[in-house]
């Protein structure tokens, strides 16, 4: 029997849709979808007990249960239902992918629109942030890329709130798993590419091709792709997009928007660049020369949505850094950064090494996550030993792995260089601070914005920035 979902939902006065039996609300429809690890059909009774008014499934074995309706394709039914319940989206959709830099770029884009008096929002690793509205959207997932239903719920609510611009991150996992569904966007960008997530994608080529799905599957025919020209695989990416009839522009030292000079300090940077044969200068409080391309990707995003470059530069000069991205703690020489890949750790260390005063030392504290890409651990140890004067190895979300073994894999990459191993991350931070001398710099890498430490299946409260602030206060109080 075929069902008219629109009529069916009207008959039952449906209030919403859900694919999670734990969070489904009263009078919502539960779609029993088989995922990679969990089958929603195993939780139909849970969903009904939690208030689901209907269950949609493609598993005929469950249709004997009252309120359970069989369809041939549950994903197709879900997409149809989404168009009924959450049809609206902000007029301008912008998506960003890349190994590093996604969170920074979507934040810069939304901030810049807001500074130009437009209502904007961004979605990503650090969550959902809305500019120009006091409304709060609940039930936001803690994923870099939301599942399609969650994305459309949020996008619909933002559109209802008159948000005009939505920038969101697209992770390789999210793209590979089809979390964006049939979403089409106006502008996409590629910030960077380096080794990560090989535990999931197995090869770097698979990882790259997963990211390129954003450009071939989700960009409107009238849209444009913005690429970082300094990506090592840029020629392959350009050929791939050209063969798929994707229009693109590049940003970087050899880009169509050409960065000609970057002057960095502990308080910010000056970026000189040429675009359309005009020389521009951008002064920003955001630290890190690797952020120059991120800022200018944001600049081109605004340009291709109708803004003039002079007003864009004026807005970007006022953009603030986001939590945990080269975050300088209260004017000290202590930085907290999310760098958790070999490439991002190397860039952060090189940046701080270049701007530290002659004769001062650079220290780094970091660990590696458990149950994640193991191949990067020794490499990150090698990078830290090469670039930092003092290396402190600690724990970072060990999950179900033995943290001592994770640290040992990192230390293997350090080789004969000296290092300090401190299991407790809080104690490692205190040790790093205690050993700082005048003008020394300390980088605390890996967790960035995170406010937890994952041990086993428990998320324990932990925030690098707050640990630093608390300890600095304790030191100050003791001295006074």
Swiss-Prot record:
The protein's required cofactors: Mg(2+)
> What Gene Ontology cellular component terms go with this record?
cytoplasm
Q: Where does UDP-N-acetyl-alpha-D-muramoyl-L-alanyl-D-glutamate bind?
A: 21, 144-145, 171, 177, 179
Q: InterPro entries, from UniProt?
A: Mur-like_cat_sf, Mur_ligase_C, Mur_ligase_C_dom_sf, Mur_ligase_cen, Mur_ligase_N, MurE/MurF_N, UDP-N-AcMur-Glu-dNH2Pim_ligase
What keywords sit in the KW lines?
ATP-binding, Cell cycle, Cell division, Cell shape, Cell wall biogenesis/degradation, Cytoplasm, Ligase, Magnesium, Nucleotide-binding, Peptidoglycan synthesis
Motif (Meso-diaminopimelate recognition motif) positions are: 396-399
Give a yes or no for keyword Transport in this entry.
no
Q: Which GO terms describe its molecular function?
A: ATP binding; magnesium ion binding; UDP-N-acetylmuramoylalanyl-D-glutamate-2,6-diaminopimelate ligase activity
Q: Which family does it belong to?
A: Belongs to the MurCDEF family. MurE subfamily.
Q: What is the protein's known function?
A: Catalyzes the addition of meso-diaminopimelic acid to the nucleotide precursor UDP-N-acetylmuramoyl-L-alanyl-D-glutamate (UMAG) in the biosynthesis of bacterial cell-wall peptidoglycan.
| Designated name of the protein | UDP-N-acetylmuramoyl-L-alanyl-D-glutamate--2,6-diaminopimelate ligase
Which source organism does the UniProt entry give?
Rickettsia prowazekii (strain Madrid E)
Q: What is the lineage of its organism?
A: Bacteria, Pseudomonadati, Pseudomonadota, Alphaproteobacteria, Rickettsiales
């Amino acid at each position: 029997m075929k069902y008219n979902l629109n009529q069916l939902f009207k008959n039952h006065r449906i209030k919403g849709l859900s694919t999670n039996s734990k969070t489904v609300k009263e009078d919502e429809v539960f779609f029993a979808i088989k995922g990679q690890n969990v089958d929603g059909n195993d939780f139909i009774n849970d969903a009904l007990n939690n208030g689901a008014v209907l269950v949609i499934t493609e598993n005929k074995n469950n249709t004997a249960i009252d309120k359970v309706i069989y369809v041939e394709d549950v994903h197709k039914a879900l997409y149809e239902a989404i168009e009924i319940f959450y049809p609206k989206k902000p007029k301008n959709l912008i998506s960003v992918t890349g190994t590093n830099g996604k969170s920074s770029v979507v934040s810069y884009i939304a901030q810049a629109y807001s500074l130009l008096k437009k209502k904007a929002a961004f979605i990503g690793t650090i969550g959902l942030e809305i500019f120009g509205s006091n409304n709060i959207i609940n039930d936001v997932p803690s994923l870099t890329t939301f599942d399609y239903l969650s994305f459309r719920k949020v996008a619909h609510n933002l559109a209802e709130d008159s948000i005009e611009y939505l920038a969101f991150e697209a992770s390789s996992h999210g793209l590979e798993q089809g979390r964006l569904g049939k979403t089409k966007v106006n502008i996409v960008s590629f910030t960077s590419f380096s080794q990560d997530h090989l535990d999931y994608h197995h090869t770097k080529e698979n990882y790259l091709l997963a990211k390129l799905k954003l450009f071939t599957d989700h960009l409107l025919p009238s849209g444009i792709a913005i690429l970082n020209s300094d990506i090592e695989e840029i020629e392959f990416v350009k050929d791939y997009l050209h063969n798929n009839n994707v229009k693109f522009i590049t940003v970087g030292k050899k880009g169509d928007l050409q960065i000609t000079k970057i002057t960095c300090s502990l308080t910010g940077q000056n970026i000189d660049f040429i675009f359309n044969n005009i020389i521009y200068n951008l002064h920003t409080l955001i630290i890190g020369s690797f952020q120059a391309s991120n800022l200018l990707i944001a600049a081109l995003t605004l340009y291709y949505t109708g803004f003039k470059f002079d007003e864009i530069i004026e807005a970007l000069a006022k953009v603030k850094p986001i939590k945990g991205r080269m975050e300088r703690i209260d004017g000290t020489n202590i930085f907290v950064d999310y760098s958790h890949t070999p490439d991002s750790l190397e860039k952060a260390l090189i940046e701080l090494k270049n701007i530290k005063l002659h004769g001062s030392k650079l220290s780094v504290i970091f660990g590696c996550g458990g149950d994640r890409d193991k191949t990067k651990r020794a490499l990150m140890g090698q990078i830290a030993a090469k670039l930092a004067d003092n290396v402190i190895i600690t724990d970072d979300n060990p999950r179900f792995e033995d943290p001592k073994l994770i640290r040992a894999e990192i230390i293997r990459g350090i080789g004969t260089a000296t290092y300090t191993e401190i299991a407790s991350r809080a104690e490692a931070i205190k040790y790093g601070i205690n050993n700082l001398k005048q003008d020394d710099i300390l980088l605390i890498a890996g967790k960035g914005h995170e406010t937890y430490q994952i041990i086993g299946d428990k998320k324990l409260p932990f925030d690098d920035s707050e640990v630093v602030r608390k300890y600095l206060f304790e030191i100050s109080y003791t001295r006074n």
